[in-house]
Structures are given as structure tokens and as C-alpha cells.
Amino acid sequence: MGFVIAVDGPAASGKGTVAGRLAALYGYPLLDTGLLYRAVGVAILDGAGDLDDPIAAEAVARALDLSALDRAEVRTRAAGEAASRCAVHPGVRAALLDLQQTFAAREPGSVIDGRDIGTVIAPHAPAKLYVTARPEVRAERRWKQLVGQGEDVAFEDILADIHKRDARDGGRKDAPMTQAPDAVLLDTSEMTIEQAFDAARRIVEDARARHRL
């Protein structure tokens, strides 16, 4: 395994932005695992399938074409909700596990963001961050993002979605979203993007120093 930077956290916490900036800084490939689950969810919806059917969802996950990650539909609000619903199925997570762990084995390193990277996908990652923010802050960020994409959505609905996704992601039996014991907590509630990135960079630099990189 190369030098893995594991970035976990709830929806709209800023982890995706932080992960992307870290990948660019160190020249490492980036895997947004949330897009995998979003792509599975979109594929199920496209086929008029049932997101709550674990067997059907697993079949879709095992047949997933990675080119689906480039579709605009995977970044919509509906895709996010679908991802959270199908991610509760152990079979779906198992189907995507090998792909994620193969990515984590890349040399000289990689950046992977998601909800169970530091606990399940790459538990021995030398650099682990758990990026979070208050639900109201995350809801406002997501609301502004969706409005900017042309979606007509109320802030209150987004906040309700955030609470539901947090409960679902943290309460699932298989690989629940939780901070790894050795992950550094990064609360971005009062931070700008630059401040969050700078804090994350310092966390990673400390880890690199411990590993003499």
C-alpha cells in the first residue's frame, strides 16, 4: 500500500473539496467513493428498480461501469439520497470493496474520500482525517450548491435530508460512518475553503513527517 490519505465525514462537510486539493498538492490519484454509491443509485433508478432491495442493488453494484461516475446525474440531490439508501446494503458495499482497496494499494499514494475509508477501506492509512461541520452549515452549503446548479429546492428540505442521511449513514449495521480512533477531527463549520485546506495540509504533513516522506 502506498501513502493513503483517508478523508471521511458526512455529506457537505467539505471533505470532497479538501480531498481534491490534497490530491492536487501531492500529485496523488483521487477516488471519491461517494460517486460509486451515487452511480449505483442512479443505475437502479434508471432501471426503475427498488433502492431498498438488497439483492437487486448488489447486482447493479457488481455490474457497475466506472464511466457512469462521469455522468452529470450522479451529482444531483436525488443521486445523493439514492446513494445513502443503497449503501446500507452489505452486498453493495462488498461489491465495491475490492475496487476501493485496489485503488488504495496504488504507489506512491492516493487520496480517498468517503465515509468508511479510515475504518474499513484503508484502516492502516498513515493519514486519516474526519472532516465535519454542523448540520445547519452543511445544509446551507449543499443548498447553495444545488441552487447554483439550477435546482429549485428549499433550505428546510435540504436540512431534513442532511439529518436523515446522517442517521442512515451512522446507523447502518455494516461499515457505519464513524470517526476512526486515529483520525484527526477537522471541523470546518467556521472555516473558509482555504482555511480548511491549510488545516488538512498540516495534518497530512505531520503524518508524512512521521513516515519520513
Curated annotation (Swiss-Prot):
Major localization listed first in the record, in broad terms: cytoplasm
Q: Where in the cell is it found?
A: Cytoplasm
E.C. numbers: 2.7.4.25
What does the record give as the reaction this protein catalyses? CMP + ATP = CDP + ADP; dCMP + ATP = dCDP + ADP
Q: Print the keywords alphabetically.
A: ATP-binding, Cytoplasm, Kinase, Nucleotide-binding, Transferase
User: Its GO CC terms?
Assistant: cytoplasm
- Where are the coiled-coil regions? none
UniProt keyword Ion transport, yes or no: no
Does S-adenosyl-L-methionine show up as a keyword for this record?
A: no
Give the matching Gene3D superfamilies.
P-loop containing nucleotide triphosphate hydrolases
Output one GO BP term. pyrimidine nucleotide metabolic process
Q: Which SUPFAM superfamilies match?
A: P-loop containing nucleoside triphosphate hydrolases
Residues that, per the record, bind ATP: G9, P10, A11, A12, S13, G14, K15, G16, T17
Q: Name one GO molecular function term.
A: ATP binding
InterPro entries registered for this protein in UniProt: Cytidylate_kin, Cytidylate_kinase_dom, P-loop_NTPase
Listed Pfam families: Cytidylate_kin (PF02224)
Family designation:
Belongs to the cytidylate kinase family. Type 1 subfamily.
Protein name (record): Cytidylate kinase
